[in-house]
């Protein structure tokens, strides 16, 4: 299996024109299509894996260009930003120490995201429980966080980890999943920031959908529940190929 990973415009090692008008979901969908064409991938060999924000992109791409995809992998992303926000508010926040949550909320209310206290609380009380549960984070995670484009992240996601408040606030394709006819696996993990039961429901809405739960993982379950994640992913690809 050949795995191709690319940095989108304004991300990682790609150019960053610092033009916020380019921070647009439809444009990013066309970027995926440009990469596909350049690599000469098609329905015979193209599996699209989208994780987190990439899951939003993968769903949107499939709704427009599914004729080009052999298989779709939606990893750790719900099909509704409002439902994600609801889960963050009603479930995730209640798992946190109330005093810690109050401090985080106060910092967010004051837009004081650069305060060292903010990440100082988020990392042990949220990231280490719901983003990656390994005691020492793998180097690629640290590297990707070090290269984050904060302007882009805040523009699309919003500054807070508790739900989406940026351009994607009202994004919701839950009613359109039935239109994605491509074989699809929906992957989630017990400790993810996403709602595992909602993700399971998503798989039932896809005509050729299946669900994979990583019981010990979180948002980056390809690291913290790697055996289950990779075995399930490879099994899906082999099943579609055959």
Task: Give the predicted meaning of each segment.
Residues 208-242:
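Catalytic active-site module of serine/aspartate enzymes centered on a nucleophile-bearing elbow/loop
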Residues 174-217:
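Conserved loop-alpha-helix segment in the C-terminal half of the alpha/beta-hydrolase fold
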């Amino acid at each position: 299996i050949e795995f191709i990973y690319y940095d989108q415009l304004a991300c990682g090692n790609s150019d960053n024109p610092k033009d916020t008008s380019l921070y647009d979901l439809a444009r990013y969908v066309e970027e995926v299509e440009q990469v596909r064409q350049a690599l000469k991938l098609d329905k015979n060999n193209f599996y699209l894996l989208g994780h987190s924000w990439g899951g939003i992109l993968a769903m949107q791409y499939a709704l427009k260009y599914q004729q080009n995809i052999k298989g779709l992998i939606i990893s750790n992303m719900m099909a509704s930003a409002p439902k994600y926000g609801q889960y963050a508010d009603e479930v995730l926040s209640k798992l946190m120490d109330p005093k810690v949550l109050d401090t985080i909320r106060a910092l967010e209310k004051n837009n004081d995201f650069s305060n060292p206290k903010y990440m100082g609380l988020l990392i042990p009380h949220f990231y280490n429980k719901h983003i990656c549960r390994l005691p020492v984070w793998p180097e690629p995670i640290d590297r990707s966080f070090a290269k984050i484009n904060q302007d882009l992240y805040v523009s699309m996601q919003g500054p807070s980890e508790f739900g989406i408040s940026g351009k994607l606030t009202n994004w919701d394709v839950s009613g359109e999943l039935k239109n994605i006819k491509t074989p699809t696996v929906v992957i989630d993990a017990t400790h993810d920031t996403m709602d595992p039961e909602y993700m399971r429901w998503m798989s039932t809405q896809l005509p050729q959908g299946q669900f994979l739960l990583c019981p010990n993982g979180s948002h980056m379950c390809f690291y913290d529940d790697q055996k289950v994640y990779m075995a399930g992913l490879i099994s899906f690809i082999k099943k579609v190929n055959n």
